[in-house]
Amino acid sequence: LKDIMGRLGFTVAHGPEIEDERHNFEALNIPKAHPARDPLENFYLATAQKLQGNSAGPMLLRSQTSTVQIRVMENQPPPVRIISLGRVYRPDDADDTHFPMFHQIEGLLIDKHVTMADLKSVLRLFAMSYFGGDVHIRFRPSFFPFTEPSVEVDMQWHDRWIEMGGAGMVDPNVLRAVGYDPDE
């Protein structure tokens, strides 16, 4: 995975698994009233908040690897071309497709003149390199607070489609939250 994305010009970035609300939600354009912030949908950590000091806000186990993207953008001017791989945590009931801890991979490409066509091309190239040249993927319109436009990416497996994940162009509000100019 790292080799494939490395050939496409991406480097690997890492971030903490214990996060604050700014990196896990606010900078990702997820408002306070959004269902993704519900305490029943996250693992909030009272002990971590105490260790950070009384002025610290709530701390939680990260619910997505998008937090790494925020940290990279806060510390690096464009262009940015990274992937982040890591554990994420959500209080899901364990079954065949869910578990309270699972792994995510994300990519981030920030540069001038990058389009949705570029995103789709990178995802197709990755899928062909990882799963084989005859892989079929499709893109369905979707919504994520941190991307606009947003898509779900599916891969054909035998006679059915399997969701690979979500994707999209970084929302201008996310770019502003890290000090980037969305008009550039």
Question: Residue spans of the language-model regions?
Answer:
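TRNA-recognition modules of translation machinery and tRNA-sensing kinases, especially anticodon-binding
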Residues: 1-184
